[in-house]
């Protein structure tokens, strides 16, 4: 109990100025019309959006597109914060997506932070009051915690971090997007046959890594999966709020497209 109490009792370190809060949230388009319709317009400020899926499903690409589109809504004293824990950030890809836009200095508006430990990842969040970001991206949120912690301590440390993120999203009116991995979980099923009623078979189910802990502090959850790898067609499934709806889109050089090649 003492160990659990140590993880749960901590200061947020944020000073809140409620006078600066917006009357209405800002909705950041994703770059895909079908995905925007699924999300009710796009990614909203004041919410933590969890985007998870297998490797190559477009999680980082979606984050890059959000950075480009978010730049259109930035005020003079606002920025975009991109916290990279696995080395996925590609400035040349962000510039490629923004090439069609009149805003050619998109990279100047992105504060890039390469975190090599959970301490660095957590410290980056403390910079929110001075940076005043409109969008915060953490790609990926759970990776460093999986390396440094084990068992219950891993979940408690992650939930502590996510609680601060949720607190920041609500009180600083910023959109927070985190990405996450999936893992295969073995399922054991019992089959009843004429000769043996205890026959078991092993199968696997894909689940979000540390999904239970992440879900507690996520306001929206989006699962990405590959529909057609050759044509770069991705399916986005809205998992929370529970609608069980989906939208398909393609990854192209300028970002996303809703037109499919038959």
Model-derived features: positions:
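Amphipathic alpha-helical transducer elements in NTP-driven molecular machines
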Residues: 28-32, 36, 45, 91, ...
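Hydrophobic/aromatic beta-strand patches that form the interior of the parallel beta-sheet core
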Residues: 49-51, 81-83, 111-113, 177, ...
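Conserved P-loop NTPase nucleotide-binding/switch module
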Residues: 136-164, 182, 191
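Phosphate-binding/switch region of NTP-binding enzymes
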Residues: 167-262
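The Walker A/P-loop phosphate-binding site
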Residues: 2-102
């Amino acid at each position: 109990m003492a160990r659990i109490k140590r993880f749960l009792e901590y200061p947020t370190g944020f000073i809140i100025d409620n006078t600066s809060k917006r009357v209405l949230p800002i909705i950041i388009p994703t770059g895909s019309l079908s995905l925007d319709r699924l999300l009710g317009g796009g990614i909203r400020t004041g919410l933590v959006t969890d985007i998870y899926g297998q490797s190559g499903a477009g999680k980082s690409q979606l984050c890059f597109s959000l950075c480009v589109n978010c730049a259109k809504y930035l005020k003079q004293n606002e920025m975009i914060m991109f916290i990279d824990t696995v080395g996925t950030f590609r400035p040349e890809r962000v510039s490629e997506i923004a090439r069609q836009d009149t805003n050619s200095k998109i990279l100047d508006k992105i504060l890039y932070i390469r975190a090599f430990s959970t301490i660095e990842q957590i410290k980056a969040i403390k910079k929110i009051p001075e940076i005043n970001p409109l969008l915060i991206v953490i790609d990926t949120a759970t990776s460093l915690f999986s390396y440094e912690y084990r068992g219950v301590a891993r979940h408690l440390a992650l939930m502590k971090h996510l609680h601060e993120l949720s607190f920041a999203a609500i009180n600083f009116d910023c959109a927070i997007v985190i990405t996450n991995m999936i893992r295969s979980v073995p399922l054991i099923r019992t089959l009843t046959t004429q000769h043996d009623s205890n026959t078991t078979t092993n199968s696997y189910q894909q689940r979000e890594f540390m999904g239970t802990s992440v879900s507690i502090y996520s306001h929206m959850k989006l699962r990405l999966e590959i529909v057609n790898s050759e044509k770069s067609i991705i399916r986005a499934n809205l998992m929370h709020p529970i609608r069980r709806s989906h939208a398909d889109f393609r990854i192209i050089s300028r970002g996303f497209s809703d037109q499919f090649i038959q």
